[in-house]
């Protein structure tokens, strides 16, 4: 079992603004294991970016303890390392951002090399290191290009190479794909997954998009108004979200909210027969394809008209939603619901026939 490389225990972050006290982060505890791709998701103002400044050791928490790679860095607002040790610890943490922060007057390789200016490597070793990093991010042929000659995705690749220059153990991505188009976003996420596998890199994804979490993360924490409201494996959170905000994020990421809007406009739903109901079937690791739906017809004479279906593979396990119209005798539908529950399917009744 991997050990925690980042431990945040009971973190409070408070700011004083004139006579106001702003509680940006309230009693947050998060443990991130070595090799995790860990998502921290929330809307603007949730406290995500404030928490980042604590994780990357740029800000002391007001209260609580921070442990990074086995070393306590802050405890009850006080630094626990020497200035030199803290500097070295910060080098173990790379950062990429929504805005690439490249120097316009320097080429791609010069931007990467800039991160090595305090390195003990020789000039030749630095040159080799830069070449290796640009190859690692798939940009070796653009080494001599300036940022103005690069696409958004290519600029982010340079930023990733620069962030990896000092061989960090942790990479923090603060909304790093927010300015990219969907295709480029997928390419950057695929690159981050590859780096996680190749280098054993622990990655912390700060985002407001649950789609990003779904595509790349293995664990996720959901924040709201400075509070961590839900945390767990991506599989658990997607298959059984407990908090209203988490449910909202997931319905947006899976597209089921848009699907329901369209479904509710269909005649079959507007004029639902008295012996029918509209139901949402949610499942993880369970088959709700034709064999199961056929079985409730054979056993209970309940038909299932599928109006919408979505399946995601999370951690190698299928997780999905279906919207169906179940039709049959009332007692038979109840029996079919029970059979679905016993098969591991969560059944939510959205509308009953009139």
Swiss-Prot record:
- In Gene Ontology terms, what is one molecular function of this protein? ATP binding
The record's section on InterPro entries has:
AAA+_ATPase, ABC_transporter-like_ATP-bd, ABC_transporter-like_CS, ACT-like_dom_sf, MetN_ABC, MetN_ABC_transporter-like, NIL_domain, P-loop_NTPase
Q: What are the UniProt keywords, alphabetically? A: Amino-acid transport, ATP-binding, Cell membrane, Membrane, Nucleotide-binding, Translocase, Transport
Q: What membrane topology term does the record carry?
A: Peripheral membrane protein
| Cell compartment(s), UniProt | Cell membrane
Q: Which residues bind ATP?
A: 42-49
- Return the EC number: 7.4.2.11
- What reaction does this catalyse? L-methionine(out) + ATP + H2O = L-methionine(in) + ADP + phosphate + H(+); D-methionine(out) + ATP + H2O = D-methionine(in) + ADP + phosphate + H(+)
User: What are the record's GO terms for cellular component?
Assistant: plasma membrane
Locate the ABC transporter domain: which residues?
Answer: 8-250
- Check the record and name the SMART domains matching this protein: AAA, NIL
- Tell me the function of this protein: Part of the ABC transporter complex MetNIQ involved in methionine import. Responsible for energy coupling to the transport system.
> What does the subunit section of this Swiss-Prot or TrEMBL entry state?
The complex is composed of two ATP-binding proteins (MetN), two transmembrane proteins (MetI) and a solute-binding protein (MetQ).
Q: Which family does it belong to?
A: Belongs to the ABC transporter superfamily. Methionine importer (TC 3.A.1.24) family.
Per its record, how is this protein called by name? Methionine import ATP-binding protein MetN
- Organism the protein comes from: Streptococcus pyogenes serotype M6 (strain ATCC BAA-946 / MGAS10394)
